[in-house]
Amino acid sequence: MNYMDRYNFWCQADLPEEIKQELASIRNDEEELKGRFGGDLQFGTAGMRGIMGAGSNRLNRYTVRRAAQGMAAWLSSTDLPQKAAIGYDSRHNSQLFAEVCAVAFAEAGIQTWLYDRLAPTPMLSYAVRELGCGCGIVISASHNAGAYNGVKCYGPDGCQMTDEPAAIVTEKISTIDFFVPETKSFAEYMADGLITYIGQDLWERYYETVLAEAVDPEMLKNAGLNIVYTPLCGTGMEPVHAVLGKLGVNITTVACQAKPDGDFKTCEYPNPETDAALNESYKVAKDAPCDVILGTDPDADRVAIAVPDGQGGFVKLSGNELGFMLLDYVLKARTAKNDIPEGAITVRSIVSSPLADRIAAYYGVTMKAVLTGFKYIGGEILKLEQKGEPEKFIFGFEESCGYLKGTYARDKDAIVASMLVCELAASLKLQGKNILDALAEVYQKYGFYLAHVQSIELTGADAMEKAAKMMADLRAQVPATIGGAAVTDVRDYKASIAKNLATGEKTVIDLPKSNVLEFLLGDKGSVIARPSGTEPKVKFYYTAVGENKEDAKKLLDAMVAQMSV
């Protein structure tokens, strides 16, 4: 079907009056018709994410139901436990979509647990494992703008779905009609016992599990730490207060962002990676006692921090900087207690700062680099678990503000990360220092590794094709230098080949194939290019290494300028 065929198919369906009116309002808007009906919203390992609205290429109760039916059909075809867990965030329609998913699972005879209120994404990962489920779903679009929502899908280990089951779910979805009516209502399945709410007991078990990951809780209780916290109108408010409150942290909450708000009126793009995400926090922190600012994204799997600079302003750490600062803190504290097991590992994504490798090596711990996506960090935990050695996982992080200590969940967790940030800040406060002081010491000790992430966003109906062409052009035309530094090696993760340009020697990359290209600049740094898995854009990850911060910054600026042309 072309886009008009799809549009007419929807117009002829038995739909609620408000949806019919929405469809009628775009009848003469060709661009809107193509956007909404140019295809079906795609399902992948991250599930589905898109703008909410009527249409086959939009997120609505029909596309969500179809995706959940595909998940249910896949689960029914496996030997996995016929149980599912579902969570949802603060976005518009999140609770509705969660209930739609629950009904789809119940129709397939799958016992379904649904969080009784909005909950962070890592709590869903925890629930899948704790309740022994075969799969899980979170309704969330993470840090996207308010017009978006999504369906994040999880496997039995609490990781986001891997390629093989996701491909099967996609195939199942393709066989399902859009408008198959529900056999029973949500309330009827609740009465039947096929759908059950996840109540306070599991929340408390999660809190205790997170608290058990504290490195030095008594130290934190005695530090008198003051933080300013924003949940960015999302799910972090309750669990962050519960965990940090038990540890004696004094919390000032940003009032205008404390309550759930699907419009995100005070922060249009609630992404903790951006400077603007903490703007309201800066205002509050000027008049409140503050050792550190914490901000969690709407589904509370990512966290960002800022620290007072001593001159009335604040310095926001990058996701990389917070990652290697937490890594250094955990390794230093556990080394002091002689508490690091032999063969211990830490894990980072390939696009995260290699400065972390130097920190891990200093403490005699292996650092593994995996593909982007926290499921690959979770995969390393699974390997240890299969050997009966899960305690050897120390810490994992991604530069996009995602961190995990512990094996209770298999996705990044802003709650445990917030606790670790407070521990780090408290330990430094007791020494008369702050996180900025410690960051300067880390750079001085391990080297000046400066990082920058650049997103090139593409537009138009063929935006994804443009992203693919950009990657193909980079493969075909390898630059001799970037920012004045010679390109010494090229790693093509799609071909699983690393090539030394001087010798021509090729080696195999022992990672799953992925559309990622890395240019190594010897000991000067690297540039990595990868298309987004969910949006029409290509991301460039820069690392520049210098003898001092000024040299590293000069190289970084030259690298970005060249690749931006």
Which residue ranges define each predicted feature?
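N-terminal small/polar loop signature for handling phosphorylated ligands or for N-terminal nucleophile
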Residues: A85-Y148, G245-K246, N250-A304
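Buried hydrophobic positions in well-ordered alpha/beta secondary-structure cores of metabolic enzymes
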Residues: A46, I86, L124, I137, ...
